[in-house]
């Protein structure tokens, strides 16, 4: 029987104590900083990371600017327009794809303008350190279907003030230039899939103030909160269809001055 040969916890602990000691780790890591290949990498002696404005891989993201020790009050959302109207089961990969991207999309055009050869585009996953690339890829998965731009595939929407069908990124820039708040309308199980930070970061950088859905995946909901995007849920029995929302509405969300970040953390929903 296995129980006859299986060692006791005491025997295992005695074996570990007699064979493993702190000197093993001290010896192994004593010269960890003495690596010629690592030392040969050019660097500047500084306690802060020297951001390179010419880098196409690592850039200082705008959401790190102006961070305060204490959270600021939640801004009101007035006269917002919908950037997307989505169905059920929108995954984090729909929101922030990790694969390759085309040369004629917003991300590809950005890199070409920066002098990057098409063969060196790599993927969204490899360029997660560049917010300029990642926000241009948000909601750009070819499998996403935005009901505000019927008949299109991928990252397109209708710029509602003019009716122009354009990329989600370009539309977001126009809304931001006009000072228009943005929301996303969604169905159930919004944000399922892998835990992907950029699904929340990219949403914020597009100017989205709130995502209004039937239900949220718990982890993605918490990441939206962490980035300052409000995850708002329809009341039980209500959704886009029952309220007859077609996405063209102008939306104002009242009472946000009474909401604190503790309220947002206290209520968790699962799909």
Q: Language model features by range: what are they?
A:
Residues 1-26:
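Mobile "lid/hinge" segments at catalytic clefts and subdomain interfaces of large enzymes
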Residues 1-6, 30-38, 134:
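A glycine-rich phosphate-binding loop feature that marks nucleotide/adenosyl-phosphate handling sites
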Residues 42-212:
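Non-catalytic terminal/interface segments that mediate subunit docking, oligomerization
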Residues 188-191, 216-220, 237-238:
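Acidic, glycine-rich active-site loops and adjacent beta-strand->loop/helix elements
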Residues 209-214, 231-234:
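Short hydrophobic alpha-helical runs that function as membrane-insertion/retention elements
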Residues 218-231:
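Active-site-proximal loop->helix
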Residues 232-259:
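Active-site-proximal mixed secondary-structure blocks
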Residues 262-269:
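Conserved small/polar residues in nucleotide/adenosyl-binding loops
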């Amino acid at each position: 029987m296995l129980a006859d040969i299986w060692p006791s916890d005491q025997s295992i602990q005695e074996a570990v104590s007699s064979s493993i000691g702190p000197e093993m780790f001290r010896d192994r890591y004593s010269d960890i900083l003495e690596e010629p290949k690592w030392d040969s990498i050019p660097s500047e002696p500084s306690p802060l990371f020297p951001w390179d404005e010419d880098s196409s891989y690592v850039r200082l993201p705008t959401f790190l600017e102006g961070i305060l020790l204490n959270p600021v009050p939640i801004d009101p959302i007035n006269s917002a327009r919908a950037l997307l109207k989505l169905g059920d089961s929108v995954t984090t990969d729909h929101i922030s794809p990790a694969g390759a991207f085309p040369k004629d999309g917003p991300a590809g055009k950005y890199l070409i303008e920066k002098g990057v050869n098409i063969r060196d585009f790599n993927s969204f996953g490899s360029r997660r350190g560049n917010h300029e690339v990642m926000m241009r890829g948000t909601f750009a998965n070819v499998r996403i279907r935005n009901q505000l731009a019927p008949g299109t595939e991928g990252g397109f929407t209708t710029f509602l003030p003019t009716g122009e069908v354009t990329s989600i990124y370009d539309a977001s820039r126009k809304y931001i230039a006009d000072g228009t708040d943005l929301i996303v309308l969604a169905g159930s199980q919004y944000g399922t899939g892998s835990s992907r930070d950029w699904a929340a970061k990219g949403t914020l950088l597009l100017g989205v103030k709130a995502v209004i859905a039937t239900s949220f995946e718990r982890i993605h909901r918490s990441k939206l909160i962490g980035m300052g995007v409000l995850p708002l849920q329809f009341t039980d029995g209500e959704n886009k269809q029952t309220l007859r929302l077609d996405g063209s509405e102008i939306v104002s969300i009242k009472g946000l001055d009474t909401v604190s970040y503790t309220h947002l953390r206290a209520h968790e929903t699962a799909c």
